[in-house]
Amino acid sequence: MLHDVDYVLRKLDWLRAEGIWPNGLRYLWTDAFGVVLYVSLYTETGEERWLGAADRLVADVERVLGRRRGLRIGEAADRDGQYFHYLAMWLFALARLGDLKPKYRKRGIALARDIHPAFVIPGRGVIWKMQEDLSGPYPGYGLGSMDAYDGYVSYRMLGEDALAVEIAQMRDLMERDWRTLDIEQDLGLGMMLWLAHFFPDEPWAEAQKRRSLRTLETMWVDPPGYFSRAPWLGDTKFAFTNYGVSLGLQAAGIWPGRVDRLNAFFEDWRSGDEYDREAITWVMACTSHLPGAFLTRGGEGSTERDEPRERSSAGPVVDGSASRRKGRG
């Protein structure tokens, strides 16, 4: 596991000076990674300023993206709707910050209870993208392929007892799915490795780790040192998705040389498009160099009990013919 705090501090100074992050547009996925990064920096340095930065970031995300239920995908006009896997990553961030400040764990539990009935169809799946008010699926979007795994892990990080019903529903969806699930894109493979490392002895995690590593092996391109977008797209590469693979590999404790190779390659490589200056690229680069609080510390899963719940009404039912989405990023 890398601990390159100096790299992260230099990159954060540059991001702020350029008005990219955290003083740019809000984007839920990036900001979730950012909250965990701040927790990692606090853990590494012991400096209270990083907890203050996390407090301010959470407050700004809730102010800008928060809705009556859930959080919008991003601040930009074309980032409407709500993604479940973005929300799940935000829940994970609240759990990690909640390890240090319990109010955030309570906030995460409340958010999970609020959004779960809208996205989850028990026994069927998790809707990948919903309309912004959670009134129904976003047009053209069906069931996600990894979303139950996202929710399962984040819910367990927040509270095993407080979210027992929701965890059981996610576990049931996974049990129906893990034997046949084949992930084919780089970021999804990296994130599955990351998800699996929290509960490595569970059958789904053992199987998906093996399968993900086998697929990633076919996607490694060296020279120069990167993972392609998919096995059949050897020339297609994205920096931020490779950084997600790096997180997964460090979670799995495998291929450290490849982690170093891809970090070195993407530090200098430029795509020539907007991603060269997108916050998602460089916040995830920081995570690749300092995974820290993203990784298990043993004894994961909170048993904290919360106040009696107020259940939301059940969400909409999606036509069973809706496609299952495998892509990420």
Predicted regions and their residues:
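Glycan-recognition and catalytic cores of secretory/periplasmic carbohydrate-active enzymes
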Residues: 1-329
